[in-house]
Amino acid sequence: FALAPRGAPHPATNFPAAIVAIGGHPRAPYASLMREDLIQRYDMAVPRYTSYPTAPHFSPAVNGETYARWLAALDPAAPLSLYLHIAYCAEMCWFCGCHTKATRKYAPVADYLDALLEEARLVARALPARMRIGHIHFGGGSPTLLTPGDFGRTLAHLREHYNVTLDAEIAVELDPRTADEAYVAAMARAGVTRASIGVQDFDARVQKAINRIQPHDVTARVIGWLRAHGVSAINMDLCYGLPYQTVASLLGTVDKAAALAPSRIALFGYAHV
């Protein structure tokens, strides 16, 4: 569970990546969005910003009292963002460096969620006011491993302890392999406004090599369900540097992704950890 001032870099989305807005002909927008000066400026190996302080800087000096003091010092009038990390998956994708664990049982997920909701309550109590929340992001792991009931209960809990605005963006990282239409409908009813879909690559050989078998029609079907239930803001994650990829095969994946007309495509470079 993480909290950030609204407008600050979001811990779940501020990895080094190219964010591409999609519209028009599948490849036509790309060249006009590329700037050589930005490519040169950001073409470097840097740590992933996922939290503050970053992991190497944690020490006994940063304890619960320190955290509570920081929370109490926030501007009561400032809008905030919340990030909830669901640290479990049905199985591991071999390219992934995220903090997660595979489980075939729901009991560990349920226990983890209870602890997460208690932390959300304690953080709310430490804030100087019942502060406005303009953005909620569920990341992981696989947030859609939660049952529809637990997902709805989580959002209800946040609304109870925080002032979640009526126009708040509620975003979820969604695994198309495990979410059926009933689940998508339940998310929409709970207030989800944006879905981020992990694809990485549409090539079957690449998918097998990274242990993420996800045919194109599975992704397309979930996107159709999302739009049918009113979730029109859709992100797609692609990754370059994976086994068996070529420039030609990656361009084929980009074309297929663009044809599905997502709001954004995030293109990540594979990072071996």
Feature map (PLM): residue ranges:
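Extreme N-terminal basic, low-complexity initiation segments
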Residues: 1-13
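Flexible, acidic/Gly-rich N-terminal and inter-domain linker regions that tether
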Residues: 15, 22-81, 129
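Divalent metal-dependent hydrolysis catalytic cores, especially in the metallo-beta-lactamase
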Residues: 81, 94, 170
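Short beta-strand motif preference
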Residues: 82-84, 197
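Local cysteine-cluster metal-coordination motifs and their immediate loop/turn environment
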Residues: 85-100
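Conserved non-cysteine loop/helix-boundary elements of the Radical SAM core domain that shape
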Residues: 100-273
